[in-house]
Amino acid sequence: MKLKFCGLNSIESLIHARELGADFAGLIFTDESPRKVGEAFLSKLPSFNFGETIPVCVFVNPSVLMVSNMIEMLPNSILQFHGEETDDFCRQFHHPFWKSIAVKDHDSYLLSANFPSAQAILFETHSINLHGGTGQSFDWRMLEGIDANNKFILAGGINQSNIKAAISMNPWC
């Protein structure tokens, strides 16, 4: 199983994630998030040694220019889309991407079929006000029936009291 730390917005947190062996480091590029990366941090990213940790650029309904700029800055990154992006929009960059699906009922996971080009699907808690980053878990039983051969990522509210249950869902990450 892979491990992703998300919402990293300082060089110190990136170093810590790398030292702990995180497979992925999530960097938030949306204004609605309090964990959005700042300009000073962004200016340091091109020279940062990620080691084995892969940066993940997290977007909500971004412009083509914004995504293209991040690919240029971090060519070894993965794109993660959290808005109303379509599969066509996401794959136009010819770059690996993950698509987030907000789980609100037992049929939510079926939406993953709309993203055949995604490298993985990230399932997280549905929120009326936010596109992720709630820190809340959802009832993971709503994913029963998901094809375990597909790469899926379980996100949101995973902590010491529910980590065993999260692992038992057999997520890729």
Question: Residue spans of the language-model regions?
Answer:
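Conserved N-terminal beta1-alpha1 strand-loop-helix module at the mouth
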Residues: M1-C173
